[in-house]
Amino acid sequence: MALLSAPVRRRRSRVRVLLVCCCLLLALAAPSAAAAAAGHDYGDALAKSILFFEGQRSGRLPAAGQRAAWRGDSAVSDGGAAGVDLEGGYYDAGDNVKFGFPMAFTATMLAWGVVEFGDAMPPAERAHAADAVRWATDYLLKTISHPGVIFIQVGDPTKDHGCWERPEDMDTARTVYNISAARPGSDVAGETAAALAAASMVFRDDDPAYAARLLAGARSAFEFADEHKGAYSDDPELRAGGCPFYCDFDGYQDELLWGAAWLRRASKEGTYLDYIQNNGKTLGAEDSTNEFGWDNKHAGINVLVSKEFIDGEVLSLQSYKEFADGFICTLIPESSSPHITYTPGGMIYKPGGSNMQHVTSISFLLLTYAKYLSNSSRTVNCGNVSVGPATLQQLARKQADYILGDNPMKMSYMVGYGDRYPQRIHHRGSSLPSIKSHPQRIACNDGTPYYNSSSPNPNPLIGAVVGGPGEDDVYEDDRADFRKSEPTTYINAPLVGVLAYLVGNPDPGQGHVRH
């Protein structure tokens, strides 16, 4: 049914040269007096951004500690169609499918946020964040536990998106998809390696045995990715299952570098440094892009790898610092470089829908790169202007504040934060009566009246950040408009790190651009 159509995933957009009006420059240069006076409760937003993941859980829920109490067990037999155990993990968005590619990216970004900014989190929230990482990595370890294959998806998205039903009720096919030597998927395998390696750093101190298991899994997944090169969506069967939702539009090469970069960061082993140095040009490290997300990792690779050069540890990685600088310059309106689009209200904008994924992921890179630069007193030269860490921090803060309510709509785009936020998000479990209050089954088509209802969702998915407004800063609270009203795990995952930074640095101060 058209009205129940699945989210149309985002194609890569190219950098465009745009003129930014003076009012936008002023908006980015300093917060408004009202915003500065009011401020935001970053601690509350952080807690809720992590809580969101408990509403996305698949599988048997914990007997104690499940705070999204309106959810119940679901998909407990996942993997049965292939004779394996694939219970667990996360539903990617407002549907009931487990897509391995974006789930692994979600885990990577959650882990990276804890690695970089976990010290700024209150202890309870750091523990919740680690739990969110573990829920994903426990599942990812299952996907790589059978020799010769990696399982990359559970659920038939076409059939799933034809129904509006709770995950606890779903009866659509739980088709299992895998990659192998015969049908490679370096993209998913490489991202899985990155996720497991990054997560190993989260648990290194508190659970070294689990951390070692994660790192071993990361090595195995990376070896698979590098030995069997190819994009999973090039295979007709896998393409039918994953596309148009999560096709690999940008190729698998970036995920190979991304996986190697995270294995280098986590293990410090020279093997992975050699891989990065020897294969960077071949695998497109110098690709110029101002995008970072589940499909395109180039900007993230350059920021991550540049750390060793910035810290003075590996001077041969200078080119990655140069590439990272180039990415940063595309975000600075005053720069003469071709740069990203900002809405009149100051939001980073890229066409295609679910725009907040770009806002949160780019904001995370801004803060992470600012941290690296600050540690070595470096700046970024953008030709006609020079920018320092404070400018990057202020720009990221503006984006976070936009999400939390400093925007033309005067509303928060995080469910449960502030006085005004989305009430009708595109999310099956949130929009249907809870299994706890309505234990009777709600079948596939029986959920349609709830989809069409103008009433607020009965189960607020606290912490969910929706796709957000378009280039005109306008947001209609419309469940049917999935491009704007649907939350995803990969919107929230980078935001956790952003908010953690802001908890520790509630007022980053004014950034100054030197001409």
Swiss-Prot record:
It catalyses: Endohydrolysis of (1->4)-beta-D-glucosidic linkages in cellulose, lichenin and cereal beta-D-glucans. Residues 1-29 form the signal peptide. It is found in: Secreted. Keywords: Carbohydrate metabolism, Cell wall biogenesis/degradation, Cellulose degradation, Glycoprotein, Glycosidase, Hydrolase, Polysaccharide degradation, Secreted, Signal. It is an enzyme of class 3 (hydrolase). GO terms for biological process: cell wall organization; cellulose catabolic process. Its EC number is 3.2.1.4. GO terms for cellular component: extracellular region. Pfam families: Glyco_hydro_9. The keyword Ubl conjugation does not apply. Belongs to the glycosyl hydrolase 9 (cellulase E) family. This is Endoglucanase 23. It comes from Oryza sativa subsp. japonica. The gene is GLU12.
